């Protein structure tokens, strides 16, 4: 199925690209989320008329993401208190939701889906570096300090 992308989609293309995707991917994901429209003649003409407007909107979203990434980087460190045993092992773990809540409480709105933890959840006390993917092109880093309660 041919679609016109209205947003940058990872591993697929950027704004304005006409790509061929499976019908289910287009029907169930791209179109409902507003990331693409079917590539009919009418939609192609409509898109070409609105191209500048969509590019400006995409640039605004990118600028907002850069501002949020700078705010996350400016925080430097966030401290989370959790119950732990004698040797620094936590009872339970600290996951993406806990980190997102702590950063939001510190003053920067972050969704749990933006937190990237390649090594899995945090299970020990100490300082851990956590990545944030605020936008498909914008990343931020933050140190999470886990302390015993």
Swiss-Prot record:
Signal peptide: none
Function of the protein: Binds to the 23S rRNA.
Superkingdom in the source lineage: Bacteria
Pfam families in the cross-refs: Ribosomal_L9_C (PF03948), Ribosomal_L9_N (PF01281)
NCBIfam families registered for this protein in UniProt: L9
UniProt keyword annotations, A-Z: Ribonucleoprotein, Ribosomal protein, RNA-binding, rRNA-binding
PROSITE patterns: RIBOSOMAL_L9
GO CC terms in record: ribonucleoprotein complex; ribosome
Gene: rplI
A GO BP annotation: translation
Protein name in the entry: Large ribosomal subunit protein bL9
One MF annotation (Gene Ontology) recorded for this entry: rRNA binding
Family the entry assigns: Belongs to the bacterial ribosomal protein bL9 family.
């Amino acid at each position: 199925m041919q679609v016109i992308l209205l947003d940058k989609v990872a591993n697929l293309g950027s704004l304005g690209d006409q790509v061929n995707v499976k019908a289910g991917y287009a029907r169930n994901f791209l179109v409902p989320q507003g990331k693409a429209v079917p590539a009919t003649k009418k939609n192609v003409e409509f898109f070409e008329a609105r191209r500048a407007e969509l590019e400006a909107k995409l640039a605004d979203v990118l600028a907002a993401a850069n501002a949020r990434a700078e705010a996350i980087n400016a925080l430097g460190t966030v401290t989370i208190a959790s119950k732990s045993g004698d040797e620094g092992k936590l009872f339970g773990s600290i996951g993406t939701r806990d980190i997102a809540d702590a950063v939001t409480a510190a003053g920067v709105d972050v969704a749990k889906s933006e937190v990237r933890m390649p090594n899995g959840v945090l299970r020990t006390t100490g300082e851990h570096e956590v990545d944030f993917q605020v936008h498909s092109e914008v990343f931020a880093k933050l140190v999470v300090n886990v302390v015993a309660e």
